[in-house]
Amino acid sequence: MANEVQDLLSPRKGGHPPAVKAGGMRISKKQEIGTLERHTKKTGFEKTSAIANVAKIQTLDALNDALEKLNYKFPATVHMAHQKPTPALEKVVPLKRIYIIQQPRKC
């Protein structure tokens, strides 16, 4: 048990613990410090995104006001003249053929 504590406190080559062998492959251990850094970065990111969201909401409100004014100035008939006409008949898409190729089994 004392050896385990000394192993944890002793400096490692390359600044990381040695790899663990599992299933015939060497797997590196994840460091706990790296996970702590990720959590701190996310909290800072949330604060900046909240500020950005407020700015986006304000710009969307301004755009909505401008669109309402345009809708009042130009009636719906003018907008309908510039829209793409709807087709009278729907296009029928032919079904794709499924080609089954007979191949011998791989043994």
UniProtKB/Swiss-Prot annotation:
Residues 1-23 are annotated as: Disordered. Expressed in hair follicle (at protein level). Keywords: Apoptosis, Differentiation. GO terms for molecular function: ribosome binding; translation initiation factor binding; translation repressor activity. May play a role in the early stages of epithelial differentiation or in apoptosis. This is Death-associated protein-like 1. GO terms for cellular component: nucleus. It comes from the Eukaryota. The keyword Transmembrane helix does not apply.
